[in-house]
Design a protein with these regions (language model features):
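The short loop immediately C-terminal to the conserved phospho-acceptor aspartate in CheY-like receiver
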Residues: 44-45, 73
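Basic, amphipathic DNA-recognition helix from helix-turn-helix-like DNA-binding domains
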Residues: 56, 60-123
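Charged docking surfaces used in two-component/phosphorelay signaling
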Residues: 5-13
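Short, Lys/Arg-enriched segments at the junction into DNA-binding effector domains
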Residues: 105-163, 167
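Acidic, metal-coordinating helix/loop segments flanking the phosphotransfer/catalytic sites
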Residues: 20-39
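DNA-binding patch around the recognition helix
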Residues: 114-115, 119-121, 144, 189, ...
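Hydrophobic residue at a beta-alpha junction
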Residues: 21-22, 46-49, 77
């Protein structure tokens, strides 16, 4: 399609190796053939299985790859659904080449694990965050996190008991050059709570600071 060609041309101009797929099934096959792929761009309206289902299937076996969903500006629920199925970010159509490239750049760096801290681990019972291999355990059990979820956990565990605004979290996790909306913070934290909280309806680890942001409850 024309939008796919537009994306491929601009990402190749930015220096990326790009693999194309016309359908959801083809995308999954090509990811199996190219397991070191760092970032996937998924249009929701794919022929065959849609972008949501492709995202779910990718996340079932791969938490490292960065996933960006392409959505229509008017479809707010599509953005939330995409993030809740495992996407790290979304870009609304129409978008500029600069915006898309900036989003891909940010996820590409994170998916490559470039930001590796000097210290080895952060322990706040029942959690253990290993900053060398970028993993999280709760009561000794590994919790599968995406790269964005890991980055959010790291921000919280480095700032125990401190109220962090949505803007601060956005800057620390997505970077100051991020073009998107604050909503992405809320949805990713909602997804993270599903993985770490004992009772999602009454969270005790990531608590909401109403009208401001969130706090790691230690």
């Amino acid at each position: 399609s024309s939008i796919r060609s537009f994306i491929v041309i601009n990402l190749r101009r930015a220096g990326y190796d790009v693999i194309e797929a016309e359908t959801g099934e083809e995308a999954l096959d090509k990811l199996k053939e190219n397991p070191d792929t760092r970032v996937a761009l998924l249009d929701i309206m794919l022929p065959g299985i849609d972008g949501f289902e492709v995202c779910r299937r990718i996340r079932a076996t791969n938490t490292k790859i960065g996933i960006i969903m392409l959505t229509a500006r008017s479809q707010e629920m599509d953005k939330v659904t995409g993030l809740m199925t495992g996407a790290d970010d979304y870009v609304t159509k129409p978008f500029s080449p600069a915006e898309l490239t900036a989003r891909v750049d940010a996820l590409f760096r994170r998916a490559g694990g470039e930001e590796i801290p000097q210290t080895g681990e952060i322990r706040q019972d029942p959690f253990l965050l290993n900053t060398r291999n970028r993993t999280l355990e709760k009561n000794g059990q590994r919790i599968k996190l995406t790269q964005v979820e890991y980055s959010i956990m790291k921000v919280f565990m480095e700032n125990p008991g401190k109220a962090l605004s949505r803007e601060e979290i956005l800057d620390m996790v997505w970077g100051r050059d991020y073009f998107g909306e604050l909503k992405i913070v809320d949805v990713n934290i909602r997804r993270l709570r599903l993985k770490i909280e004992d009772n999602v309806q009454n969270p005790t680890y990531i608590t909401t600071v109403w009208g401001y942001g969130y706090k790691w409850g230690f």
